[in-house]
Design a protein with these regions (language model features):
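Conserved C-terminal portion of the radical SAM core fold
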Residues: 17-23, 239-243, 263-402
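N-terminal pre-core extensions flanking Radical SAM catalytic domains
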Residues: 1-21, 25-31, 36-163, 179-180, ...
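Glycine-rich, phosphate-binding/catalytic loops in enzymes
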Residues: 36, 202-207, 234-237, 259-263, ...
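Eukaryote-biased activation of long, low-complexity terminal tails and linkers
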Residues: 158-172, 179-186, 202-208, 212-213, ...
Length: 403
């Protein structure tokens, strides 16, 4: 069995991973949409109606794996193909790099069992346990933030019911029990995981039953919560990755991730870093039209802290896309990022990707007036609802779009 070529369309996720969201939907990853599949009997599996074993051994999953082994591009994976076709690094590419070590072990074993019912269970599980969150970030949705759900419903942007995001504790306990012998990586996302008593309870269970010593735990957090109990629990895991969702420094992040306080987040990052020797700590920044003028400040902060920062381009919602900005703002952002000193790029790997994308938008500039109007309307409506003003948080951006 040969290892897939680096430049192929192969993705490791259907061979080793499961993703479960707060509504109970289960897929190989968070970007995959099975309803967009060309498979004749496509369906969305849900742990409220089935179990992870049935989904993992389903004919659909065998079909998906088979497509990747034939070097095809499954239509349900369009989000990754879109990114790659525009020169961006996709989740597929990152996942293949992250799991390269298992290509010769679990990948080969599961390859031999394609079409059979005894595929080894996933060893990488990502769970969005609930949408319970203490912030309402600009790029988020009600599916991932209970606070933003309330705001979006009030503004008429969504029609979701909070009860749809309340899975039973027993559902997750059942899943972890089923994966007890295979699970190596557990990724917990939000809402805000550390704001959620259910997550703390889950971590306690993993520590008490001894699984924590065998698990690499990944938690994505907004950095607003840190206490001694959480630190004590996290110390028990074999390996730990804490990813802080930060979109700027100071007032910029407070606007992007409202109603956070920067001094609290900065202090918590330091506290986690100093008290968790088993942790790899990094920052994930959602690059969008609201914060692109301030990325150089974030680079300076992460460099001072000696923390790696990864930049992820926001595609949805489309009113936050970089292409919606006036040309003068794109040019300002390009000049600022291009002038960042090499010493401030020691702890990142994809700034040049963002710089190149800005240049492409400038060189092929074609502003959609309707999208720009929607961008301004969204800012004004959210600011009015939150009783804040953009110019008090990000004056450079406010002045730039005003001119």
């Amino acid at each position: 069995v040969e290892k897939p070529k680096n430049k192929s369309n192969f993705c490791i996720k259907p061979f080793n991973s499961a993703w479960i969201d707060a509504t109970g939907e289960i897929n190989a990853c968070c970007f995959l949409d099975p309803l967009q599949s060309e498979y004749t009997e496509k369906k969305q599996y849900n742990i409220k109606e089935t179990d992870i074993k049935t989904w993992w051994g389903s004919d659909y999953m065998k079909y998906l794996r088979s497509n990747f082994l034939k070097d095809k591009r499954p239509t349900e994976c369009s989000e990754c193909w879109k990114r790659e076709d525009t020169g961006l690094i996709s989740y597929r590419m990152r996942s293949n790099t992250e799991h390269r070590a298992i290509f010769k072990s679990k990948y080969q074993r599961n390859l031999k069992l394609i079409g059979k019912d005894d595929l080894q269970f996933p060893d990488d599980l990502q769970m969005n346990i609930t949408n319970l969150c203490n912030l309402k970030c600009q790029m988020c949705s009600g599916e991932h933030s209970s606070k933003l759900l309330v705001e979006n419903n009030a503004l008429g942007y969504e029609d979701l019911n909070q009860k749809d995001f309340d899975l039973k504790d027993s559902d997750y306990v059942k899943i972890l029990e089923l994966l007890k012998h295979d699970l190596k990586i557990l990724k917990i996302l939000g809402g805000e995981p550390l704001f959620n008593p259910r997550v703390i309870k889950l971590l306690e269970m993993l520590v008490e039953n001894g699984q924590a010593k065998k698990i690499k735990l990944h938690i994505t957090t907004n950095g607003t919560i840190c206490d001694d109990k959480i630190i004590s629990l996290l110390k028990n895991f074999k390996d730990l990755r804490l990813v802080f969702s930060v979109d700027g420094v100071g007032k910029c992040n407070e606007y992007m991730r409202f109603p956070s306080r920067w001094e609290v987040i900065s202090a918590n990052i330091t506290k986690f870093k100093e008290n968790l020797v088993n942790a790899y700590i990094m920052v994930n920044c959602a690059v969008q039209n609201l914060n692109v003028l301030y990325l150089d400040e974030l680079l300076e902060f992460t460099n001072q802290k000696k923390i790696f920062v990864k930049f992820e381009l926001v595609i949805h919602p489309n009113w936050l896309h970089l292409s919606v900005l006036p040309k003068n703002v794109l040019s300002m952002a390009y000049e600022k990022l291009s002038s960042v000193k090499e010493k401030d790029l020691l702890h990142t790997d994809n700034v040049k990707e963002i710089i190149e994308l800005l240049k492409q938008h400038i060189d092929n500039y074609n502003l959609d007036e309707n999208k720009y109007k929607n961008f301004i309307d969204m800012i004004n409506k959210r600011d009015t609802y939150r009783k804040i003003k953009l110019e008090n948080y990000m004056p450079k951006l406010a002045r730039a779009i005003a001119t």
